[in-house]
């Protein structure tokens, strides 16, 4: 791929990756080595790297409605700004020149400046990795397509609760016209 490409690494934060967390995604930790390879590839090809993260107020007021219960009755919530749980996992830590987009909903585009950032940088191609398929991966991929970006989801660099959920989402996204390929296929294209 040429310049004008951005790699999104979505929600690779402690509260989604580490075992025992309320919203830990089964299989997410297993994708870390593959995402690291993709990240190294993106960096070596001078792609724009964008780390997309969830970040919520400690009272959960800006969390999506179905998950606000995680902030109630003495529960500590998830991805609370400034906490260890909201931090990007160490293996994928951003470099100083990489962009961090903070979101409060599934899509990285919803109520963020992501589209403006991409247009300012003359990005045409969006490569998506991270967790998890039915929520943030799919929401971001569909919105990127709706904004007329060429979208690639790197299938072995994304995760879901089960392989069946991942496969169902891959089929749906392919049917929408979103390119879904492996890291090896991306590197050989």
Predicted regions and their residues:
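Active-site-adjacent betaalpha module
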Residues: 1-6, 33-45, 57-63, 69-189
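Short acidic, Gly/Ser-rich segments with clustered Asp/Glu that frequently serve as metal-coordination loops
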Residues: 15-19
């Amino acid at each position: 791929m040429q310049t004008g490409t951005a790699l999104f690494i979505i929600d690779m934060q402690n509260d989604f990756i580490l075992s025992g967390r309320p919203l830990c995604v089964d299989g997410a930790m297993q994708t870390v080595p593959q995402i690291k390879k993709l990240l190294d590839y993106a960096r070596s090809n001078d792609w724009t790297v964008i780390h997309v993260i969830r970040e919520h107020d400690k009272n959960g007021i800006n969390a999506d409605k179905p998950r606000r219960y995680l902030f109630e009755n003495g529960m500590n919530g998830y991805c609370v700004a400034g906490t260890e749980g909201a931090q990007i996992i160490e293996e994928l830590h951003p470099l100083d020149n990489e962009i961090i987009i903070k979101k409060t909903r599934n899509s990285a585009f919803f109520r963020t400046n992501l589209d403006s950032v991409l247009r300012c940088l003359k990005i045409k191609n969006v490569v998506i990795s991270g967790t998890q398929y039915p929520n943030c991966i799919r929401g971001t991929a569909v919105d990127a397509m709706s904004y007329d970006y060429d979208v690639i989801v790197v299938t072995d660099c994304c995760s879901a609760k089960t392989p069946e959920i991942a496969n169902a989402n891959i089929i749906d996204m392919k049917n929408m016209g979103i390119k879904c390929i492996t890291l090896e296929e991306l590197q050989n294209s």
